[in-house]
Amino acid sequence: MARYLVLAVALLLAACSSTQKKPLADDPFYAPVYPEAPPTKIAATGSIYQDSQASSLYSDIRAHKVGDIITIVLKESTQAKKSAGNQIKKGSDMSLDPIFAGGSNVSIGGVPIDLRYKDSMNTKRESDADQSNSLDGSISANVMQVLNNGSLVIRGEKWISINNGDEFIRVTGLVRSQDIKPDNTIDSTRMANARIQYSGTGTFADAQKVGWLSQFFMSDWWPF
């Protein structure tokens, strides 16, 4: 019996444990893309000025091709609130008046037959959930792909090493070239299919995780 009990506890602990892999700083999915341009042949003219290395004072510095860098200004703010409630009432009432027969009450053992029954049930449940988050900052990302309509697929990450762990920001999404500002920045709210992840690894991050016992009480395995 004890063997089956230990096996059941082990299965519950395995079900409550998290299987999410820890993020890696060198994830190839977020590896930068470097533009591969063919070498430009520079003709020897004897002059210091070269047309191939010149740039116009009025040229557009905004990202527009694969390998370019763009800065995303994080301006994320979310707030969600949900409340629910229900109330169930149920009641029943039944009575049986004394029975008269022959001008007198029918009794059993001298006790008149008189039956009364009353039952009631009242169940009330309420739940509230309120959550708000905000994220401000900036991160530079690479242009990974240029679509036919001119939209840019961007992706990038930033890792910051602190005493007892690392913090990282990862971002990926789709932006329109028209939404990029002249200083080569774009607000995160202008990104489509945005995936923004801000988290950490190490001692501080592990301290914020919920323990296995608390996970069990909050999981579907808890019967109450």
From Swiss-Prot:
Any one cellular component term from GO for this entry? cell outer membrane
- Family per UniProt? Belongs to the FlgH family.
Q: Which HAMAP family match?
A: FlgH
Q: Its function? A: Assembles around the rod to form the L-ring and probably protects the motor/basal body from shearing forces during rotation.
Record has Calcium as a keyword: no
Q: What is its main location?
A: membrane
Specify one Pfam family.
FlgH
Q: Identify the keywords attached in UniProt to this record, alphabetized.
A: Bacterial flagellum, Cell outer membrane, Lipoprotein, Membrane, Palmitate, Signal
Q: Where in the cell is it found?
A: Cell outer membrane; Bacterial flagellum basal body
Positions with an attached lipid (S-diacylglycerol cysteine) read: C16
Provide the species name: Shewanella baltica (strain OS195)
Cite the GO molecular-function annotations of the record.
cytoskeletal motor activity
Cited PROSITE patterns: PROKAR_LIPOPROTEIN
Which GO annotations describe the biological process of this protein? bacterial-type flagellum-dependent cell motility
Q: Where is the lipid attached (N-palmitoyl cysteine)?
A: C16
Signal sequence residues: 1-15
InterPro entries membership:
Flag_Lring (IPR000527)
- Provide the protein name: Flagellar L-ring protein
Q: How does it assemble?
A: The basal body constitutes a major portion of the flagellar organelle and consists of four rings (L,P,S, and M) mounted on a central rod.
Top-rank taxon = Bacteria
Q: How does it sit in the membrane?
A: Lipid-anchor
